[in-house]
Structure formats: structure tokens, C-alpha cells
């Protein structure tokens, strides 16, 4: 099978604009010749491989604007409120990641099915890999502003707020971290699923079913990340940012098994099961 996915009516600045993703899927099944005559063994092998595309949602495509206020001047006097003045410079940033792509996932699996004398065993192994999953990444922006000096100003002799043109200032720079949506998640999933069902034993009219699975998930960052040290020298934080690979991640494993005893008593028209 083949499925296509695309987002329409996007701004041409998006890399997703006009891009079509194709998700092919192939399944195959092979039944081997039976082995034996009295109680023949049946074996079936099957498998499949395919792609799955997940598009970013509205919140990722159109994030809110980021507003950042920096105080350049804050002159205040209790005795003469008429001279009070504050000057704030506001920065407005667009946090849209126009390079955001769809998250692509490739999964394949194989299955073996064995049947003999009403006993059946199914074993499935699967593996799933995604290297472009969505996550919140960090982006640093440099903001340059002026810090005005109020040294030498005497509120008692002033008739109005200070004029910025008459004040000396020192240019300053601040690095601000922001959250942006990226394709920085790498996820690898693999596992084995199995199920065994026995024939119904005549004496106790009971059938045993055993099913379970083993799963393993590996999650980490597929893109470099920015980090800023928290060291403070002379009352100011260091203005350097480092770029590092894979600063986080984890591996999760789980295994579970379930035993079910299914009993049928036709004379009493009664059936019940017990699971452990």
C-alpha cells in the first residue's frame, strides 16, 4: 500500500510548503508445506515494513511571539515624583522554526506461526526507528541595549524627568534562552511478542494460554544542544555558550507474561478462566 501526506496553505518560508511525504507499506506471508502426516506441523512466516509520517501540529507551526523587556533607565524619587522616568526597550522575536520537518518513523516486523495438534505458538519481533521526532530545543538570542547612568542627577533641583539625550550610557549585551520546536528526538523501539495456546485437555476441559512481551526503548537527542555555564565573575555571568552533543537520554526495558487457564464445562453450560 501507499499513503501520501502533505500540509497545504503554508507560507513559502516553511520547508513543509508543497512537500509531499510518501508512506509505503509492504506485507508478505509464506505458508510452508506441512511436515508429517498424523499430526502435521504447520509453519507460516510473515512480515511487513513501512513508513509513517507525523506532521507538526498548529502549536509547533505557529508558536506565540516572544516578548522580552529590558530596562534601560529607572530613575525614581520619593521627594519629587515629577522627575520619575523609566525607559524600557522591548524586543519581539518570532520563534517559528521554518525548517521544521515532519517526523518520519520506519517500522518492520517478522512473525512465525507454528501449529501442531491444536497447539499454537506465535512469535513476533519488531523494530521501530525515528530520528526526526519533535522536541523542545534551546535557542540563544543576543540582545543589545543601553544602560543609562543617573550619576550626578539631583531630584531636588530638577523640574522634569531626565532627557535620555543628556545621559551617558554603556552598551550592554544579554544572552537569553528560548524554547523552539525542533526535529531533535531520536527514538528506537524494539521488542518480542509471543503467544502460546495449548489444546484443551479432555480430562479437565482446560486450555492454557501464555502471552507476553519484551520491550526496549532508547531515547536521546539527535541534535547538538546549547549550554551556558552558570559561573559568575565580578558580579556578571559568563557570556559564552557551548555547543554539545547528546546531553540527555535514557533506555527503558520491560518484560511481562500472562498465564490464562480457560475451562469449559458443557454439561453445566459453564465456562470460566483464571489469569495470573
Predicted segments with their positions:
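Outer-membrane beta-barrel proteins
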Residues: 5-11, 54-60, 69-71, 121, ...
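Short clusters of hydrophobic/aromatic residues that line enzyme substrate/ligand-binding pockets
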Residues: 22, 58, 100, 134, ...
Amino acid at each position: 500500500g501507499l499513503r501520501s501526506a502533505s500540509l497545504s496553505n503554508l507560507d513559502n518560508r516553511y520547508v513543509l510548503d508543497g512537500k509531499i511525504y510518501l508512506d509505503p507499506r509492504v506485507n508478505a506471508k509464506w505458508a510452508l508445506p506441512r511436515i508429517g502426516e498424523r499430526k502435521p506441523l504447520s509453519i507460516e512466516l510473515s512480515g511487513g515494513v513501512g513508513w509513517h509520517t507525523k506532521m507538526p501540529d498548529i502549536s509547533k507551526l505557529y508558536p506565540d511571539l516572544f516578548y522580552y523587556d529590558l530596562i534601560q533607565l529607572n530613575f525614581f524619587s520619593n521627594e519629587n515624583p515629577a522627575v520619575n522616568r523609566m525607559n524600557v526597550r522591548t524586543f519581539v522575536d518570532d520563534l517559528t522554526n521554518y525548517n521544521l520537518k515532519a517526523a518520519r518513523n520506519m517500522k518492520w516486523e517478522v512473525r512465525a506461526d507454528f501449529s501442531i495438534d491444536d497447539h499454537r505458538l506465535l512469535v513476533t519481533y519488531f523494530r521501530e526507528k525515528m530520528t526526526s521526532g519533535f522536541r523542545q530545543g534551546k535557542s540563544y538570542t543576543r540582545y543589545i541595549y543601553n544602560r543609562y547612568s543617573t550619576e550626578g542627577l539631583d531630584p531636588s533641583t530638577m523640574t522634569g524627568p531626565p532627557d535620555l539625550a543628556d545621559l551617558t550610557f554603556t552598551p550592554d549585551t544579554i544572552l537569553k534562552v528560548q524554547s523552539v520546536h525542533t526535529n531533535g528526538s531520536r527514538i528506537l523501539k524494539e521488542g518480542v511478542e509471543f503467544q502460546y495456546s495449548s489444546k484443551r485437555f479432555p480430562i479437565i476441559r482446560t486450555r492454557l494460554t501464555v502471552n507476553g512481551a519484551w520491550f526496549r526503548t532508547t531515547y536521546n537527542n539527535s541534535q547538538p544542544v546549547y549550554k551556558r555555564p552558570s559561573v559568575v565573575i565580578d558580579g556578571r555571568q559568563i557570556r559564552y555558550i557551548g555547543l554539545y552533543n547528546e546531553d540527555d537520554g535514557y533506555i527503558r526495558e520491560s518484560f511481562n507474561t500472562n498465564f490464562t487457564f480457560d475451562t469449559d464445562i458443557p454439561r453445566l453450560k459453564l465456562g470460566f478462566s483464571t489469569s495470573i
